[in-house]
């Protein structure tokens, strides 16, 4: 199916809640058009505008667009083989030249991650209205960034980092989709305990909201790209690595049952996906290395 982004617009809900909406038109096989959008809460990410390469934000916008498409198109209804969907996407995005140069890598990466057939093309867009964020030392002193989903592996990753780096300060990167409230609740419960034991050793803001305006598909295979896109913004500013804490068994997701064959298994932290994404981060001139310290471990 043919898909194109149509506009970028900013809305202000409060002084500290400005949201970027990227509108998307999805043309279904029958010719009907679904209008969806990717909604990104800009606080606190707007603080880093002008402080890191622009390509860092383009990667965030790309991940949000992919997530919105992934969540808006039902697999069962629109797959070509019972699982995989075909997406021909025209993406209007800042810094499009760099993404266009590496579109083959991006299409390969997305197709492996979600189990779909992605054919993305990148074109320029009108400039996004600037967002002013007050200067702050809040993000200074960060020595590491770790994905923090609220699951057991991300909990262990945070604890290990703070235990092994007593003089360090870790940023726990989280994502929030209001259509899926479970992870945010888990994150909040864990942080209550962190405040007692690791006060001053970590930084965790309320999970950054990125969600589609339509929520029909729940497999969410593209979610990890968005997690990492959020993390790389902070890591690019702090000039540190990104820890992706996931035990090796889950990363590889062995096909131990028929339901886990091929792309039915999640590939969110699969070594192939992380290697492809690392190459993309490098060619875009961004800083962080992606590190999974538990790649050769299991629970």
Where are the regions that the model predicts?
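Alpha-helix C-terminal capping segments
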Residues: 149, 159-165, 230-239
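ATP-dependent adenylate-handling ligase core
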Residues: 45-51, 175-298
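RNA-binding accessory domains that recognize and position tRNA/RNA substrates
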Residues: 1-146, 158-169, 173-208
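Short, glycine-rich nucleotide/cofactor-binding loops
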Residues: 146-152
């Amino acid at each position: 199916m043919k898909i194109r982004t149509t506009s970028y617009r900013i809305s202000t809900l409060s002084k500290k809640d400005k949201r970027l909406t990227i509108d998307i038109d999805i043309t279904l096989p029958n010719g009907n058009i679904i209008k969806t959008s990717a909604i990104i809460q800009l606080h606190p990410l707007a603080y880093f505008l002008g402080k890191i390469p622009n390509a860092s934000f383009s990667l965030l916008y790309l991940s949000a667009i992919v997530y919105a498409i992934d969540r808006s198109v039902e697999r069962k209804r629109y797959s070509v083989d019972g699982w995989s969907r075909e997406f021909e996407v025209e993406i209007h995005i800042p810094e499009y030249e760099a993404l266009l140069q590496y579109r083959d890598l991006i299409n390969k990466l997305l197709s492996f991650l979600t189990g779909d057939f992605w054919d993305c093309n990148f074109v320029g867009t009108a400039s996004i209205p600037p967002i002013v964020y007050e200067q702050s030392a809040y993000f200074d002193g960060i020595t590491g960034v770790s994905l923090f989903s609220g699951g057991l592996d991300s909990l262990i990753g945070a604890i290990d980092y703070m235990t092994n780096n007593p003089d360090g300060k870790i940023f726990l990167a989280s994502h929030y989709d209001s259509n899926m409230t479970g992870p945010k609740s888990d994150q909040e419960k864990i942080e209550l305990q962190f405040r007692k034991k690791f006060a001053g050793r970590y930084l965790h803001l309320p999970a950054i909201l990125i969600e589609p305006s339509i929520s029909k598909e729940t497999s969410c295979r593209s979610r990890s790209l968005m997690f990492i896109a959020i993390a790389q913004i902070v890591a690019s500013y702090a000039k540190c690595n990104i820890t992706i804490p996931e035990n090796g068994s889950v990363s590889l997701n062995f096909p131990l049952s028929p339901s886990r064959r091929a792309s039915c298994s999640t590939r969110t932290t699969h070594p192939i996906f992380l290697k492809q994404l690392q190459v993309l981060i490098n060619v875009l001139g961004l800083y962080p290395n992606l590190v999974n310290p538990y790649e050769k471990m299991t629970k």
